[in-house]
């Protein structure tokens, strides 16, 4: 019986510890392309577009880049056009 009581006590402590913790949520920053003096999204600006492409050449999602949905669509279209015009590579080579 002692073993079962100890097991239930430790389980109660674990549950109590979970409820005692406060969860901290980080406040999301705004869209970096919606602020005043932000660069214009254009397929002719590969320096800007390459910031939103991963090391392997894939477009980064907005949850990583914190770009709003409207600007994310413009970015995706600009990256696709820049790839077709050979301003950006489709796949980056590993170094």
From Swiss-Prot:
Keywords: Ribonucleoprotein, Ribosomal protein, RNA-binding, rRNA-binding
Top-level taxon of the source organism: Bacteria
PROSITE patterns recorded: RIBOSOMAL_S18 (PS00057)
Protein's name according to its UniProt entry: Small ribosomal subunit protein bS18
MF GO annotations: small ribosomal subunit rRNA binding; structural constituent of ribosome
This protein's GO CC annotations: cytosolic small ribosomal subunit
Assembly and interaction partners: Part of the 30S ribosomal subunit. Forms a tight heterodimer with protein bS6.
Example of a GO biological process term: translation
């Amino acid at each position: 019986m002692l073993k079962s009581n100890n097991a239930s006590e430790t389980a109660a402590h674990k549950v109590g510890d979970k409820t005692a913790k406060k969860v901290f949520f980080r406040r999301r920053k705004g869209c970096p392309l919606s602020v005043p003096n932000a660069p214009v999204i254009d397929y002719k600006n590969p320096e800007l577009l390459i910031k939103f492409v991963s090391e392997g050449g894939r477009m980064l999602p907005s949850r990583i880049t914190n770009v709003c949905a409207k600007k994310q669509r413009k970015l995706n279209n600009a990256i696709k056009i820049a790839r077709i015009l050979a301003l950006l590579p489709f796949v980056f080579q590993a170094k």
